[in-house]
Amino acid sequence: SASPGLPKGEKEQQEAIEHIDE
């Protein structure tokens, strides 16, 4: 889902954004 190399918190935030976008 999120790009590799991102911090855990940022990964969770990115996934949340994807859910909102969907």
Curated annotation (Swiss-Prot):
Q: Where in the cell is it found?
A: Cytoplasm
Residue ranges with Basic and acidic residues bias: 8-22
- Which stretches of sequence are listed as region Disordered? 1-22
Any single Gene Ontology cellular-component annotation: cytoplasm
Q: What keyword terms does UniProt attach to this protein?
A: Cytoplasm
Subunit comment: Oligomer.
Q: What does this protein do?
A: Has a role in the physiological regulation of fucosylation processes.
Protein's UniProt name: Fuctinin-1
